[in-house]
Amino acid sequence: MPAIQPPLYLTFLLLILLYLIITLYVWTILTITYKTTVRYAALYQRSFSRWGFDQSL
């Protein structure tokens, strides 16, 4: 009797599931990083423009 192998569709299903999990994980991290970066950039820009305005006066 040959070694029991899982059906091919099950393997593909597992791979697709793994791919989806990884994609979702990466997408979440990138979104959070992007939002944080944009927020900090806006804060820095605001403080920098205010500082520049104060210096010009």
Curated annotation (Swiss-Prot):
Subunit structure: Interacts with host TNFRSF1A, RIPK1 and IRAK1; these interactions interfere with host NF-kappa-B activation at the level of receptor complexes. Interacts with host protein UBQLN4.
Membrane topology: Single-pass membrane protein
Keyword Membrane: yes
Protein function: Plays a role in the inhibition of the host NF-kappa-B pathway. This inhibition occurs at the receptor level, by preventing the signaling of TNFR1 as well as IL-1R and TLR3.
UniProt gene name: SH
Lineage of the species this protein comes from: Viruses, Riboviria, Orthornavirae, Negarnaviricota, Haploviricotina
Residues passing through the membrane, by range: 9-29
Principal localisation: virion
Any single Gene Ontology cellular-component annotation: membrane
Side of membrane Intravirion, spans: 30-57
Keyword Transmembrane helix listed: yes
Name of the protein in its database record: Small hydrophobic protein
Keywords: Host cell membrane, Host membrane, Host-virus interaction, Inhibition of host NF-kappa-B by virus, Membrane, Transmembrane, Transmembrane helix, Virion
Annotated family: Belongs to the rubulavirus small hydrophobic protein family.
Subcellular locations according to the entry: Virion membrane; Host cell membrane
Pfam family, one: SH
Species in which this protein is naturally found: Mumps virus (strain Kilham) (MuV)
Virion surface-side positions: 1-8
Disulfide bonds: none
GO terms under biological process: symbiont-mediated suppression of host NF-kappaB cascade
